[in-house]
Amino acid sequence: MSAPFPGTLIDRSFRERIVLVGVVFPGTSAEEVEASLDELALLVDSAGADVVGRVVQRRDHPDPATYVGRGKAAELADLSRAVDADTVVFDEELTPAQQRNLEKLLGRTAIDRTAVILDIFAQNARSPEGKAQVEMALMRYRLPRLRGRG
């Protein structure tokens, strides 16, 4: 199935294999994170991909470089290879630097919940105005993430 919108983030020519990642921070329960990952799994399915793994980590705060820390990122890389995942989706917003660092460490695409939601909107935009609005939102999302990609 080909993408109906040229700016989508998940490749719909096949069903991408996705690993989900959630982090339990102080003040948040493991049950809340699991419920959020369940919702994210539904979003990923709506975007046309299959969840093949999920990882939850407890942390006091996000790692500024990799969000989950280098050790967990290495575990994610191993898991992603083992389950032949195409993409790793984080339940929380990644900074552009975190996304770049994770993609280097994981050896595959790393995106966040916002990217999945934008992708669903891109897939379902039909009117010219809707397509233009989605394209603008995608450009705003991607702009800070373009450094070093050209």
Which residues are covered by each model-predicted region?
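N-terminal accessory targeting/assembly segments
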Residues: 1-119
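Extended, highly charged alpha-helical segments
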Residues: 114-150
